[in-house]
Structure formats: C-alpha cells, structure tokens
Amino acid sequence: MRILYAEDERDLNDLVTRRLVAEGYGVDSCLDGQQAWDYLQAADYDAAILDIMMPHLDGLSVLKKLRAAGKTTPVLLLTARDAIADRVAGLDSGANDYLVKPFALEELSARLRVLTRSQFGAGDSRLVAGDLTLDTGTRRVKRGGAEIVLSAREYALLEYLMHNKGIVLSREKIENHVWNFDYEGGTNVVDVYIRYLRKKIDDGHERKLIHTVRGMGYVLREETP
C-alpha cells in the first residue's frame, strides 16, 4: 500500500516514515503542504496522513483541495490542538480520522490499518491468485491453506504484485512503489526480493505464480503447469 505522509517537523517525519516502511508500506513523505498537494495530484494513494500546521499550505487546505478534486483518498489529520472546534473543522472538511499530538506510533499504525481496511471494504480485503491468498486486513498470507511468514518488505512486494495480477511490472515501478527509490538502474534489490518471494511462495508447488518477463520485469499470474 502506498501512503503519503506530510509533516513539517523533520525528526517526527523521519521517525514515522521509518516506522511505516518497517511495517511494509510504501511511503512518500514531504515537509510542507504544497509538496503534499503536488504529490496528491501526481499519484493515487491508499491513504494520506496530513499535519494541519504546515508551511505554504496547511493540512486543512490540502484536504479541501483533495475533496474538491473528487478524490476519496482516506485522510488522517494530525494536530497539536485538541479543541473540539478543530476536530469538527477537520471532519467537516472531509477527514476520515483525527489524531492529536503527541501520539503513540502504535496508535497511528492502528488507525492507518482501519483507514485502509475501510477503503478496500470488508468484502475486498482478500487478494487471491490461484491457491494463494493475501488478507490486507490481517496481513496474513497463505498458499494451499498453509500460512507463509513474510518480512515487511516481502509482504509489500507481494501485495503490489497481487494488486496488479496479470500486469507486467518493471523494476522501476516496483522500486518506486515498494522502496520509494528513484530508479537509476544497476541495483538488484528487486531481483533479490523476487528470489526471496519465489522461495517462499512457489518452491514446492507445481504451478508457479511469479514469472519473469525478459527485458520487461515481473508478473504474478496463474499458468497451467
């Protein structure tokens, strides 16, 4: 899942970004509201976390622009102000949730999970490819009924492949989504993690799901053995 995080306190921005990446999210982070709005215009996100008090453009203004543009991206607002009027203003502007600083990282993670579950809906939380299932709500992966334990990065890669089942994804797209890298070529991080996933997902199964498309990238699809 791809998350936008906008927070002008650099230390907090770095801390939260590291936490979300460790949990398997792809994260674009920025330090002011104008950058946040630029990101939101350029890409679709599974959720956005916006601080209210930011330079150039405050979080409420970003949120209003987002809703005026017809985008339904789930938004969690962050603020140091706990006044009821501030909460009402945020919710009236289209926020899905509201978190007051200082907050525990565990609470932020829990609220983000609720937001992303709500976006996909209870009936859409399971991604399926053959006998492979991934539950985005519980973050559990099974193949043939057997549970598969994945690292946070392996999970993020598999989720991206399954969301794009049948679509060939270039190394550049995978790096940008899963690692938040600006692709420069020469790195083999995608190939390494594809090998990790194949060992856990495909080894021991006659029907392989993760395929290499020479010169193009990788695709997850069902093929007859």
Please name every model-derived segment.
Residues M1-A122:
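N-terminal/domain-start alpha-helical segments
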Residues Q35, G215-V219:
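Glycine-rich nucleotide-binding loop
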Residues K71, G123, G130, E206, ...:
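Residue-level signal for beta-strand positions within conserved beta-sheet cores that form or flank
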Residues Q119-T138:
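CheY-like receiver
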Residues R140, G145-L209, R214-M216:
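Positively charged, aromatic-enriched patches within helix-turn-helix-type DNA-binding elements
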Residues E222-P225:
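Intrinsically disordered, low-complexity protein-interaction/activation regions
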